[in-house]
């Protein structure tokens, strides 16, 4: 989450309600009991949209595990943890983080772990998302473009996998947001907005979100 980071997650959900949000999402909620998050969602009537798999060992710089060939066991444990947590709080999706890796073995590993995630998520009605990260903020991250993500989604061949289209990352990676949004809409499961280049409030910066939101509405 980008807002109310000074609060614990249940209180941040309550703050979102007071700010007239009707839904929330979070990154890594695992230091908070799922029942406490579930209670805050029930109290406020807000919907939890989604959460991420653990990054791994953040002290050594991990940013996901699922494309790292030698860490499949850890990656699948993180997937299981995320899906089990999600089963308690009923979000729409789980974002499976790839991590820092490259090459054919990393690709093969990521596809295999995503197939595992999709199969594990089906009984819970969850969608699995993947998200390209830009090379300025996450140099060396395995999933580095929307084209690569599209190829992987096609290879996984699961009904419950989709693209997280983070406008901030896509603009820094490739630009041309309007056309990319139109081209990729059939595989997009979730869209995120933030200003470019400072990743702040979307009401300023290099991208006109007024235009982009209107374009998205027309596409839908």
Predicted regions and their residues:
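A short helix-and-adjacent loop within the catalytic ATP-binding
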Residues: 41, 121-122, 217
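Conserved small/polar residues in nucleotide/adenosyl-binding loops
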Residues: 210-217
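Glycine-rich S-adenosyl-L-methionine
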Residues: 149, 208-209
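Active-site acidic/histidine proton-transfer and metal-coordination neighborhood
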Residues: 65-162, 172
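N-terminal pre-domain/capping segments
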Residues: 1-87, 150, 154, 158, ...
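Active-site-proximal loop/turn and secondary-structure-junction residues that shape catalytic pockets
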Residues: 2-4, 30, 54-57, 98-102, ...
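Histidine/acidic-residue-rich catalytic or RNA/ligand-binding cores of hydrolases
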Residues: 174-181, 201-208
């Amino acid at each position: 989450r980008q807002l109310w980071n000074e609060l614990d997650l249940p209180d941040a959900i309550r703050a979102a309600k007071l700010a007239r949000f009707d839904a929330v999402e979070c990154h890594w909620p695992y230091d908070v009991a799922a029942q406490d998050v579930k209670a805050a969602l029930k109290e406020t009537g807000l919907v939890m949209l989604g959460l991420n798999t653990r990054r791994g060992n953040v002290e050594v710089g991990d940013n996901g595990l699922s494309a790292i060939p030698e860490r499949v066991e850890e990656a699948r444990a993180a997937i299981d943890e995320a899906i089990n947590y999600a089963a308690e709080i009923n979000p729409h999706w789980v974002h499976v983080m790839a991590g820092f890796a490259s090459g054919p073995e990393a690709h093969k590993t990521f596809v295999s772990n995503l197939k595992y995630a999709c199969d594990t998520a089906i009984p819970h009605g969850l969608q699995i998302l993947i998200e390209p990260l830009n090379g300025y903020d996450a140099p060396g991250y395995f999933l580095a473009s929307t084209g690569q993500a599209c190829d992987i989604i096609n290879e996984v061949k699961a009904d419950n996998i989709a693209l997280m289209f983070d406008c901030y990352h896509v603009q820094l990676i490739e630009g041309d947001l309007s056309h990319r949004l139109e081209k990729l809409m059939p595989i997009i499961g979730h869209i995120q907005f933030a200003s470019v280049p400072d990743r702040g409030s979307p009401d300023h910066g290099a991208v006109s979100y007024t235009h982009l939101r209107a374009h998205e509405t027309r596409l839908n």
